[in-house]
């Protein structure tokens, strides 16, 4: 039964029109006192029934109980009795599941310090009732809209004296039914298999919190067979997370060995005349490859010499051209390498670049070169094409010389079905995949790095590429369940994370990296494409870049390797974690198959074979890993690389150079391990004389005295180029506002860049769009400190490029390029790790796999019913727990943030809005606990005292003024 009390009724005697003087009798005064006493009594009783958790500045009295399936919300609220009521808001405890705030009802069985979550409720004029038995307390309350000046209140009184146990049971059942109804309402909107997946892997609260947009996205999931046409082997999102987890462990079986920094020297053979600048100076050398036997892959013995072709160029000059190096076969002395000069001659053009490739010996002794021709003329965004040329060499006076270059021609530029072409790439470059009204311009075009291999009498090229129409990029890739690669729980959480984050959604929709394969015809010296095939490996939704692929045939198996960077992937959290743990994020990936075009299996489960060990700006930082078979071995490979990032990253005097090589072993179970075997710098052949201990180091000796753990990623990974369009970062929290991932900030300390400002870095700083021509590592462009050598500028008599019209340089350059536009540096501090001794294999794990690859929580069996609240849906579901910030004083915001605090802040910032009231109505009478009873008892006692004082005051006033006359006997 509802009891409504009018505070003005029976308190003022009716005016008598015929009386000139108002008189009060003792009977009427008594009535006033009785009424006041009744008000105080009701206030006392109400204090045991109604407890205000939060009261805002409102005049109208509202008591609501709402259950709205459309908003997936069931909440109980009650307002203060009048505008003059005062109550103290209690602390709010919130439990977040998926991304909603869950609220539990308070019953007698719950401890007094348990309080519900608070949500904002709009005033409603709809009356929502929940009928109950006559033997149980009524749960019916009305939602009333009233003007701000109204002082009426609707308060429910107890209607039964049933036991509290029965009330608890009834309440829990009602709330559980309400909760299940809301969850079932959302489940009913899902179709087929995705409905079962959601039901099995999400809690009721999470299901209730699903938005209409999420439900719509879930219904678009494509469960097509994993063996999708045009896919090849998929590098999945699960693989990516596992790669990062392995990276963080710094497992000695996978981590690149430490090299002793003070033993590393610049390559003497590259103190030479630069093909483009025409100045003699020490120049950088990076991607390199030997002339190999196309059948076995071993380094060819060409007339007693080993030959290597390298990309090289003057620092900070955007000089990207290839040179021929040679040394006596079997010689292990790094200083004995000699430079035959640029293959395509001097006076080279900045816009006509040559990038990575491979080479083999033809039957007539000539060298067949396969390389990447890159055109940046007229503002082109790195138009890469596969090319080939024949090198005619000779030995003259113990020197290898380039006599001529012939048959230089384009082999392949993309067919648009198997492999994306540059025109097709440009046709969608301005598309808006994340639907924000602006062109994305984050796509990355790759068609480069051809690697020659001969199998069953035919020559094939393996190359880096992007997929074509056969299995093209686009939003559809986000909805392909097979691209996620994990169990349903992992896939579901990852899917919701991506669809709720427009930036990840953007990158994932464009990512369509692939490792392609084509067959050449039988013309060795002037080949053309005979046949195209579906890619061997694809990385839809994961990355656009899988660089420098190569296939090694060994032990009856085919091993496929590629180099990559985590920061070029869609795992922003993984990039941050890797950079914070190590200071770099480069890896070598590997796959194995029983045939050249067979199904490739990822090595070590995820595909990771090598992980970086030192910060990217150290002298001993390595990249561009290239595996060469060891002659006579069926399970061992020699890994080569270049060392020191270009453009003076480790100091202007430290040029990019060839690193010492080391061995890795392929195990029968498709696992790999780094062996404690190292060579001198620049060794491409492993034999009995190859092993050297000169460069063996540990973590302490792997850096130069002036090197520390502050990494300038803008210079190292950005090379002066613009990053992908990522959300802005809150400098006070270090958190990306779009997806709440932790950014790594500067650590206080002295270093060679200590004079530069501390600036938070985006978790994906260094992820670059093709708009910025980012395809391979480059550098930022400081002032050029490299002066021409005073030595005589001897110019070898090598062929020069054909005449070409002058071209206006384009301001953006690719990763392959050596341009270094000046920029503001961003330093990221990497925690100093303790020395692990001088053993290459002795490493301490930096982080656990679970920290980077967290599965979706399984369905939780609730110990009590919960009432989902109507709260703002979080923007995304974070896949990983963000790493701790370097600065302890910085606040970190995670996806588990208490949304109740946000509501409270919102209330504080919107005072004066008298329509928002949030409180909770207990459903059974109970004695107030110590925490809540004191306030309610005080209020009721004060109300009673006030009523008594008011009665006495009126009586005294009437007697003194003569307005009240005591009756005479």
Curated annotation (Swiss-Prot):
Annotated SUPFAM superfamilies: Arabinanase/levansucrase/invertase
Q: Would the keyword RNA-binding turn up in this protein's UniProt record? A: no
Q: List the disulfide bonds.
A: none
Basic and acidic residues: which segments have biased composition? Answer: 747-758, 872-910
Stretches that traverse the bilayer: 938-958
Q: Which residues bind Ca(2+)?
A: 443, 473, 512, 544
Recorded family membership: Belongs to the glycosyl hydrolase 68 family.
Protein role: Catalyzes the synthesis of levan, a fructose polymer, by transferring the fructosyl moiety from sucrose to a growing acceptor molecule. Also displays sucrose hydrolase activity.
So where does sucrose get bound? 286-287, 356, 448-449, 545, 565
Localization terms from the record: Cell membrane; Cell surface
Report which superkingdom the organism of origin falls in: Bacteria
Which keywords appear in this protein's UniProt record, sorted alphabetically? Calcium, Carbohydrate metabolism, Cell membrane, Glycosyltransferase, Membrane, Metal-binding, Signal, Transferase, Transmembrane, Transmembrane helix
Q: What is this protein called?
A: Levansucrase
Q: GO: which molecular function terms?
A: levansucrase activity; metal ion binding
User: Active-site positions, per UniProt?
Assistant: 287 (nucleophile), 547 (proton donor/acceptor)
Starting at the broadest rank, the lineage of the source organism is: Bacteria, Bacillati, Bacillota, Bacilli, Lactobacillales
Transition state stabilizer, annotated site positions: 449
Q: Where is the composition biased (Low complexity)?
A: 89-103, 124-166
The record's Gene Ontology cellular component field reads: cell surface; plasma membrane
Which stretches does the entry tag as region Disordered?
A: 89-169, 746-843, 860-934
Tell me which EC number(s) this protein carries: 2.4.1.10
């Amino acid at each position: 039964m509802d009891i409504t009390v009018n505070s003005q009724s029976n308190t003022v005697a009716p005016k008598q029109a015929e009386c000139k003087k108002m008189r009060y009798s003792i009977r009427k005064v008594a009535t006033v006192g009785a009424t006041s006493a009744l008000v105080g009594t009701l206030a006392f009783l109400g204090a045991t029934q109604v407890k205000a958790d939060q009261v805002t500045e409102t005049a109208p009295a509202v008591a609501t109980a709402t259950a709205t399936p459309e908003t997936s919300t069931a909440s109980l609220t009650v307002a203060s009795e009048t505008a003059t009521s005062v109550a103290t808001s209690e602390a709010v405890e919130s439990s977040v599941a998926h991304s909603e705030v869950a609220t539990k009802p308070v019953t007698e069985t719950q401890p007094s310090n348990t309080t519900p979550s608070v949500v904002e409720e709009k005033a409603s004029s709809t009356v929502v009732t929940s009928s109950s038995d006559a033997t149980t307390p009524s749960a019916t309350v009305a939602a009333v809209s009233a003007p701000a000046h109204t002082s009426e209140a609707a308060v429910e009184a107890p209607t039964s004296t049933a036991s509290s146990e029965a009330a608890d049971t009834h309440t829990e059942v009602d709330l559980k039914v309400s909760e299940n109804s809301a969850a079932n309402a959302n489940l009913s909107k899902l179709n087929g298999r995705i409905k079962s997946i959601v039901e099995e892997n999400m809690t009721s609260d999470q299901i209730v919190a699903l938005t209409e947009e999420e439900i719509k996205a879930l219904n678009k999931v494509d469960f097509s067979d994993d063996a999708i046409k045009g896919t090849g082997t998929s590098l999945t999102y699960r693989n990516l997370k596992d790669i990062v987890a392995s990276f963080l462990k710094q497992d000695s079986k996978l981590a690149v060995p430490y090299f002793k920094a003070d033993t590393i020297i610049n390559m003497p053979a590259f103190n030479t005349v630069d093909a483009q600048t025409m100045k003699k100076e020490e120049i950088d050398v990076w991607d390199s490859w030997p002339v190999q036997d196309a059948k076995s892959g071993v380094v060819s013995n060409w007339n007693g010499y080993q030959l290597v072709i390298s990309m090289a160029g003057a620092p900070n000059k955007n000089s990207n051209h290839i040179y021929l190096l040679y040394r006596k076969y079997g010689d292990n002395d790094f200083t004995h390498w000699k430079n035959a000069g640029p293959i395509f001659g001097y006076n080279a053009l900045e816009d006509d670049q040559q990038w990575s490739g491979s080479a083999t010996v033809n039957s007539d002794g000539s060298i067949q070169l396969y390389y990447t021709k890159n055109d940046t003329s007229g503002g082109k965004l790195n138009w890469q094409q596969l090319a080939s040329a024949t090198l005619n060499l000779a030995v003259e006076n113990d020197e290898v010389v380039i006599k001529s270059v012939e048959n230089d021609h384009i082999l392949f530029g993309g067919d648009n079905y198997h492999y994306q072409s540059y025109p097709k790439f440009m046709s969608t470059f301005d598309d808006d995949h994340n639907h924000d009204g602006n062109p994305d311009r984050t796509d990355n075009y790759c068609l480069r790095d051809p690697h020659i291999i001969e199998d069953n009498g035919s020559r094939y090229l393996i190359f880096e590429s992007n997929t074509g129409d056969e299995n093209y990029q686009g939003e559809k890739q986000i909805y392909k369940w097979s691209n996620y690669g994990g169990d349903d729980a992992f896939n579901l959480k990852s899917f919701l994370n991506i669809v709720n984050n427009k930036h990840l959604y953007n990158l994932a929709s464009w990512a369509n990296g692939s490792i392609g394969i084509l067959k050449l015809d039988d013309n060795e010296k002037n080949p053309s494409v005979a046949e195209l095939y579906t890619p061997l490996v694809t990385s839809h939704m994961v990355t656009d870049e899988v660089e420098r692929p190569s296939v090694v045939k060994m032990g009856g198996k085919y091993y496929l390797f590629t180099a990559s960077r985590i920061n070029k992937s869609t795992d922003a959290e993984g990039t941050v974690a890797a950079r914070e743990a190590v200071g770099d994020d480069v890896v070598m990936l590997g796959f194995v198959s029983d045939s050249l075009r067979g199904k490739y299996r990822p090595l070590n489960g995820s595909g990771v074979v090598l992980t970086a060990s030192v910060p990217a700006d150290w002298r001993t930082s390595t990249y561009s890993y290239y595996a060469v078979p060891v002659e006579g071995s069926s399970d061992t490979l020699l890994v080569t690389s270049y060392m020191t990032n270009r453009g003076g990253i480790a100091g202007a005097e430290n040029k990019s150079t060839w690193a010492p090589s080391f061995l890795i072993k392929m195990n029968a179970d498709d696992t790999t391990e780094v062996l404690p075997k190292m060579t001198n710098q620049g060794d491409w052949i492993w034999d009995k004389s190859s092993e050297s201990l000169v460069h063996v180091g540990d973590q302490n000796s792997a850096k130069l005295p002036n090197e520390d753990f502050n990494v300038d990623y803008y210079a190292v990974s950005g090379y002066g180029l613009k990053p992908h369009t990522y959300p802005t970062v809150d400098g006070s929290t270090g958190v990306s506002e779009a997806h709440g991932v932790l950014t790594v900030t500067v650590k206080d300390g002295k270093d060679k860049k200590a004079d530069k400002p501390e600036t938070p870095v985006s978790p994906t700083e260094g992820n670059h769009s093709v708009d910025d021509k980012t395809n391979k590592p480059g550098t930022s462009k400081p002032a050029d400190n490299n002066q021409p050598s005073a030595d005589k500028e001897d110019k070898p008599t090598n062929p020069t490029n054909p005449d070409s019209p002058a071209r206006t340089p384009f301001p953006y350059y690719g990763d392959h390029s050596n341009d270094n536009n000046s920029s503001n540096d961003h330093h990221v501090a990497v925690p100093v790790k303790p020395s692990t001794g001088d053993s290459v294999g002795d490493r301490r794990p930096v982080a656990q796999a679970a920290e980077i690859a967290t599965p979706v929580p399984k369905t939780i069996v609730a110990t009590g019913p919960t009432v989902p609240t109507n709260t703002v849906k979080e923007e995304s579901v974070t896949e990983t727990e963000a790493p701790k910030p370097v600065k302890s004083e910085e606040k970190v915001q995670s996806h588990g943030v208490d949304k109740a605090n946000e509501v409270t802040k919102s209330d504080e910032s919107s005072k004066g809005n008298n329509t928002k009231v949030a409180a909770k109505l207990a459903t059974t009478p109970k004695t107030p606990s110590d925490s809540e009873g004191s306030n309610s008892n005080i209020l009721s006692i004060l109300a009673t005292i006030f009523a008594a004082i008011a009665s006495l005051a009126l009586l005294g006033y009437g007697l003194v003024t003569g307005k009240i006359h005591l009756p005479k006997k």
